[in-house]
């Protein structure tokens, strides 16, 4: 059997489509109260400061990174970036990233332009590499993105999430963006390994980046990056 022919469409249980993209997601959050570090993990006590996506349309991959002080704009930008056929991918994305964004959307009064089906064992809308690895067993201890990336030969994380709060306090948005983008690239490589695919090269000039501390979005040139 040629295992490399298996694709995320097969794993997700849906047919391939020109409109269907794999959108790898990672978010960074901070506590509303800086003295409560664990508050960053709960949508009632934390907020999103960066959302990074890597969209693979079967031909090329491009990055979209939304970061800054205007959380409502960041989250609305995430929902607007999703297309109807997109499959959202990430590590622990079901229990954290998507849940957090949905809950913050309720709090901020943002209506998503689509509903992601996050039912257990259902992978047409969302594929979680953590659940893929553990086969929904609930035995998640030690299965971090860093550990899984290392075990699969995909690389390791380039920083620590604990640094995000400090960067935020120092208004160092660029460091938060770089850290979030590096995580999303690692998650993409892990997903490709688990689904027997080759990571695509990041498309030149296709990365959209805006920081909400400025009035208008700016599109930045993205250097050609080999994701393998």
Stretches with model-predicted labels:
Residues 1-7, 204, 224-228:
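Short linear clamp-binding motif
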Residues 2-81:
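Conserved RNase H-like, two-metal-ion catalytic cores of nucleic-acid enzymes
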Residues 4, 35, 40-45, 112-115, ...:
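Aromatic-residue detector
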Residues 20, 46-62, 87-178, 182-207, ...:
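Metal-dependent phosphoesterase core characteristic of DEDDh/y 3'-5' exonuclease domains
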